[in-house]
């Protein structure tokens, strides 16, 4: 399975599931037209790291979501924002064939070489106390500090590895209080 470098922005969970059947990738769902401030923060962070690919349905709603993302990111330099487009009009990502999705994404995607992507494992999260009972406060502290958005352990691990956050950085946040976020990140609001 090929590994995609950029975060892919899709409309919903079914779109995300479909992409993960085809590629190893990090996906963010907008949940439709009402994109949360938290999602925008994660996307801004992704722009500064590996970039994003907007891959919405090829219908009017998909176009509106694409425009809203661009407007809310207030990002004039489009170099780190790529657009994957389905060739058929009024086609949903989740209902598209494997070939259609691969064709759309391969035009704009950067791929990792196998083995080039390293990072933390679920065992690391367990050792850091970010999973299991009594872990919620610690996990939320890490998610908020690094602007990773909310989510389950799998999503947390995926985003930690996507943003190449080191175990030592996480340990520092867990053990310190009121530390400012890394350079280039806004303090949590």
Residue ranges and their predicted role:
Residues 1-11, 16-22, 26:
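Glycine-rich, flexible N-terminal cofactor/catalytic loop recognition
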Residues 29:
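Conserved PDZ fold ligand-binding element
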Residues 2, 21-25, 33, 37-179, ...:
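TOPRIM fold recognition
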């Amino acid at each position: 399975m090929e590994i995609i470098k950029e975060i892919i922005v899709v409309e919903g969970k079914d779109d995300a599931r479909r992409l993960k059947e085809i590629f190893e990738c990090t996906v963010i769902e907008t949940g439709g037209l009402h994109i949360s401030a938290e999602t925008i923060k994660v996307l801004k962070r992704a722009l500064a790291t590996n970039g994003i690919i907007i891959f919405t349905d090829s219908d009017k709603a998909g176009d509106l979501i694409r425009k809203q993302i661009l407007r809310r990111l207030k990002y004039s330099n489009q170099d780190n924002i790529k657009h994957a487009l389905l060739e058929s009009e009024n086609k949903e990502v989740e209902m598209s064939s494997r070939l259609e999705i691969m064709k759309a994404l391969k035009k704009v995607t950067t791929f990792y070489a196998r083995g080039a992507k390293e990072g933390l494992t679920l065992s690391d999260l367990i050792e850091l106390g970010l999973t299991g009972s009594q872990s919620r406060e610690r996990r939320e502290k890490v998610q908020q500090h690094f602007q990773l958005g909310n989510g389950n352990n799998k999503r947390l691990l995926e985003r930690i590895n996507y943003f190449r956050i080191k175990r030592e950085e996480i340990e520092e946040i867990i053990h310190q209080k009121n530390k400012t976020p890394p350079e280039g990140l806004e303090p949590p609001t």
